């Protein structure tokens, strides 16, 4: 706690024939972060043909999965599925090397891919045919108004026939121009249909070029003449039957597709996951160095996992390996990847720390402090027992439902579980149960403080809490800089604010505790003097401007904690409005029916659920902001290098390595 996981540097050199199995072992363990071996002028490893095939097959499998998904029945969804997701079953695969894995994938694809592609091709063909038939049916419905046999609407050897739609207001001018350019050798038939006119143009074949150009000028929408003979109205039933036949054929093909999808979908997902992990492994090959017979790698490993890693390497290589384990040197400290280490009950708060950035290896991990203060700030801003209870119930359900997955939702729900506990406690202290609902119902509620009527007191509390929060940050910054040997920064950047905050605190308490003025003035003066000296040393010529800017920056950061009061007041205010609206309609009756009670209950339930959601969102964001901007700004850079293990991502597969 407060310190990241101890990390050591592990260097391994062994025979090239062990490369694939050793990489797979490290990948499955998922406890080592691979780094590029820092040796210039030596040959780097590259993916061989099997790794390249893995990349290609990963893409192929992904496309096949997308195809068969369309034929599977829709998955269960909804709130229940979100809260209690089904755990995916894992299937074991005996890993005998990438060559054998590629052979297994090729064998599977050789069986499954042709069947899937065949169904895909058939579905595409039938969809195109149905679409074409529907277009023809639409054309027949338009042409039926002409009452002309369909064969007469097709061109002849000496005649050109164009049938289509044109804007109704343009049709007169179009007909005139047609007669002019064809010198009277043209026949037109017109049928007005709302805003469009259906037009048949018959001309000599030799004039067709000029006719078509003119039709295009007027925005003529050509209608393709369907197959068949006879009147359009007589052909329509035949086309409807043809469409039904094709749709029945399509359903049969889709049914076949569903059978294939149900047979192969899980296998496709399984093999894709295997290929994805091989693909990821290939991305790290350039980190390795090699000769004709050997290869070497460099890894960062948590100290607690080193023994397990070394034992595994020796087992896989039959002891034919050079392994060096050592602590990072002073020069390497900046480059050491950081893995946060906290007790299980607060480890989920690491997610919030990592969102900002991890500490450097020689810095303090703020997660233990953030776990308490974030939850407290959230509770202070939401500050209602019922809201906290509602949030707690939802969070508890999500924690239970995602407990086996240990995913981001599970971590977030555990954070909200803490936050809801603080919200309920502070809700009791402030006597807030859906705002003042119990007070309006005539129930006497005990409370230490009323947010609405004692807003000024709540503001003073918020500023006092903020001062304490900033003080903690400056103390931590002082400790980190002093410990890391940067004593000047500790004395000139953190210590001045420590004295200034103590001085402000003594001044605030002086009237109650009888502290002499000279005491707080002396402490404040020392802090101010150190602050000015620090500004002069650090900023030289810009010291005057930056002294004013930085001092008022501190004041701004301090006053920013007033948002604790503002959001607590907003929560109470919104709840009060909901309660007043419900109270206004409560007595409404229509005859003997107490309609107002029903409406009032709906307003109370819906309104307070909305209030919980909107105010919880505000509390979440602003509690984060107070840490990321105000608190972390006092001591924490978040510029560390996050530990990113070389780890397999497995949801449906499990590897058994044959060494």
Curated annotation (Swiss-Prot):
Disulfide bonds: none annotated. Its main location: membrane. GO terms for cellular component: plasma membrane; proton-transporting V-type ATPase, V0 domain; vacuolar proton-transporting V-type ATPase complex. Keywords: Cell membrane, Hydrogen ion transport, Ion transport, Membrane, Transmembrane, Transmembrane helix, Transport. The chain crosses the membrane at residues 376-396, 415-435, 460-480, 489-509, 513-533, 542-562, 566-586, 590-610. The keyword Membrane applies. It is found in: Cell membrane. One of its GO terms (molecular function) is ATPase binding. It is a multi-pass membrane protein. The keyword Metal-binding does not apply. GO terms for biological process: vacuolar acidification. It comes from the Archaea. Pfam families: V_ATPase_I. Belongs to the V-ATPase 116 kDa subunit family. Has multiple subunits with at least A(3), B(3), C, D, E, F, H, I and proteolipid K(x). Component of the A-type ATP synthase that produces ATP from ADP in the presence of a proton gradient across the membrane. This is A-type ATP synthase subunit I. It comes from Pyrococcus abyssi (strain GE5 / Orsay).
């Amino acid at each position: 706690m407060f310190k990241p996981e101890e990390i050591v540097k592990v260097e391994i050199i062994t025979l090239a024939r062990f490369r694939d199995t050793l990489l797979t072992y490290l990948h499955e363990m998922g406890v080592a972060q691979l780094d590029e071996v820092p040796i210039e002028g030596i040959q780097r490893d590259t993916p061989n043909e099997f790794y390249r095939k893995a990349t290609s097959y990963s893409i192929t499998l992904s496309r096949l999965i997308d195809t068969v998904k369309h034929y599977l029945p829709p998955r269960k969804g909804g709130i229940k599925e979100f809260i209690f997701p089904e755990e995916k079953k894992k299937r074991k695969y005996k890993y005998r090397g990438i060559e054998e894995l590629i052979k297994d994938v090729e064998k599977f694809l050789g069986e499954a891919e042709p069947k899937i592609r065949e169904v895909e091709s058939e579905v595409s063909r039938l969809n195109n045919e149905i679409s074409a038939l529907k277009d023809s049916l639409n054309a027949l419905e338009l042409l039926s108004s002409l009452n002309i046999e369909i064969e007469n609407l097709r061109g002849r050897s000496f005649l050109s026939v164009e049938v289509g739609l044109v804007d109704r207001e343009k049709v007169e001018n179009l007909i005139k121009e047609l007669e002019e350019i064809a010198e009277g050798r043209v026949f037109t038939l017109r049928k007005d249909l709302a805003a469009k006119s259906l037009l048949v143009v018959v001309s000599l074949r030799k004039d067709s070029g000029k006719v078509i150009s003119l039709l295009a000028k007027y925005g003529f929408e050509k209608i393709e003449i369907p197959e068949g003979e006879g009147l359009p109205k007589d052909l329509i039933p035949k086309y409807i039957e043809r469409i039904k036949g094709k749709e029945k054929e399509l359903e049969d093909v889709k049914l076949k597709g569903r059978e294939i999808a149900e047979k192969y979908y899980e296998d496709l997902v399984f093999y894709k996951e295997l290929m994805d992990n091989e693909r990821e492994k290939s991305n790290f090959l350039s980190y390795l160095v090699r000769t004709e017979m050997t290869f070497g790698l460099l890894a960062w490993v948590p100290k607690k996992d080193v023994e397990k890693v070394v034992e595994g390497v020796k087992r896989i290589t039959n002891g034919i390996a050079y392994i060096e384990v050592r602590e990072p040197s002073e020069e390497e400290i900046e480059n050491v990847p950081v893995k946060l280490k906290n007790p299980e009950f607060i480890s989920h708060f690491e997610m919030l720390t990592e969102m900002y950035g991890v500490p450097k290896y020689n810095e303090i991990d703020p997660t233990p402090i953030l776990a308490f203060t974030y939850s407290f700030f959230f509770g202070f801003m939401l500050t209602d027992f019922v809201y906290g209870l509602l949030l707690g119930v939802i969070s508890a359900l999500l924690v239970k439902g995602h407990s086996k997955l240990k995913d981001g939702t599970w971590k977030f729900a555990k954070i909200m579980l803490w936050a809801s506990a603080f919200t309920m406690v502070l809700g009791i202290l402030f006597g807030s149960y859906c705002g003042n609902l119990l007070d309006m119902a005539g129930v006497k509620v005990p409370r230490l403080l009323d947010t609405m009527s004692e807003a000024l007191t709540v503001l003073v509390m918020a500023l006092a809490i903020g001062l304490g929060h900033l003080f903690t940050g400056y103390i931590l910054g002082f400790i980190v800089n002093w410990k890391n040997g940067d004593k000047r920064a500790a004395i000139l950047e953190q210590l001045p604010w420590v004295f200034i905050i103590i001085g402000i605190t003594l001044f605030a308490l002086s009237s109650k505790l009888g502290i002499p003025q000279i005491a707080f003035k002396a402490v404040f003066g020392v802090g101010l003097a150190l602050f000015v000296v620090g500004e002069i040393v650090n900023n030289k010529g810009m010291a005057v401007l930056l002294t004013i800017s930085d001092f008022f920056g501190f004041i701004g950061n301090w006053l920013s904690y007033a948002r604790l009061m503002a959001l607590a007041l907003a929560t109470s205010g919104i709840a009060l409005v909901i309660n007043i609206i419900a109270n206004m309609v409560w007595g409404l009756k229509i005859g003997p029916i107490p309609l107002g009670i029903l409406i009032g209950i709906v307003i109370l339930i819906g309104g307070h659920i909305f209030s919980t959601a909107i105010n919880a969102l505000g509390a979440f964001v602003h509690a984060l902001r107070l840490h990321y901007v105000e608190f972390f700004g006092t001591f924490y850079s978040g510029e560390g290098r996050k530990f990113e293990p070389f780890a397999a991502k497995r949801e449906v597969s499990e590897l058994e390595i044959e060494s």
